[in-house]
Amino acid sequence: MANSGILRLGNYLLIDRLGEGGMAEVFLAQYSGGEHSVGPQSQVVVKRIKPSLYKSTEFPVFREMFLNEAKLVRSLQHPNLARMYALLEAVDDDLGVKVPFIVGEYIRGVQLWELMRLGTQGFTGKGVPPAIAAFIAREMARGLGHAHAHKDPATGKAQPIIHRDISPENIMVSQDGLVKVIDFGVAKALGGFGPQTRTGIIKGKLAYMAPEQVTQKVVPATDVFGAGIVLHELLTGRRLFGGSNEYLVVSRVLKAEIPRPSSLNPGVPKELDDVTMKALSRDLRGRFADGNAMADALTAVLESVPALSGTTHHTIRDWVRKLTSEAKQVAQGWEEQESGLHVDVQNALAHSVAKGEDVV
């Protein structure tokens, strides 16, 4: 989509496809006039159901899931959650089908998985600085904690929203060092509205799911386990529950020994070790009850451990800029090497031709 021209959806020009999942696709979009813009930014994110599903017999299910996400997310306002501006409808010009779409905040930044890839040297066992890991995990937990503390607007009763898909792909770090949880596409409100998960379908990425997700019994602590996996991988630079197939991954989630981060990275303080392992308790009774509890524990560690104290958004910002700058330099170096090789080959060919040598 990025190089195939610009499409329109309602009053928004879809400029570039930013990503896609099994059900939906996300675009960088520009407000193009007409009715008043629904967001403070001229550039926004537009999320819609993939057009290939419009004619599917499952489209009503996908539509219900999509509308459920919008209902959940629009009630959440927090600095560590990507903001949703509006749920709108428009006719798809190509197919003539009326479809819903979400307009949300465009975060100028990088997905955490990319920062982890750069910061851990491709998951080769080098963890990111513990202070960076702890701060990112604390901000992530704060965003989740806000969702977990959600109340039904009509009754005021507790109605926790469970993300169910916490992974490095669904965490953004902005250019300013702000950490934001994105994509509540498979979220569930306990005791609230929304489609029920059909029997046999597990929501979320297998390598980041909690053991109880196998039996579809999700609670706020379910998200904590996913956050714990992310924190563990940040600290160690290794996949925690990798595997060559889905069965092996699920088996490891359920039974594999979980090493303390410090056993793989001696630079991890004991206090941060303890928080990580508590988040990864397979027994719900031993795990943080929700995101806020995990965030509070990480705040205490960040404030009490000298090696971690003083970490701020500016620290994260500088780290992100350093990583991305180094990545650009490496890429530029490869391009220069390839360009130099191309020139060398051309010179060699020219020299051979001048001497009358065969070059084929």
Describe these PLM feature segments.
Residues 348-360:
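Long, low-complexity, intrinsically disordered segments
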Residues 207-347:
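C-terminal lobe helix-coil module of Hanks-type protein kinase domains
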Residues 85, 109, 118, 304, ...:
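A structural signal for alpha-helix termini and helix-coil/disorder junctions
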Residues 197-199, 339-340, 352:
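Intrinsically disordered, low-complexity serine/threonine-rich repeat tracts
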Residues 1-259:
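Conserved ATP-binding/catalytic core of the eukaryotic-like protein kinase fold
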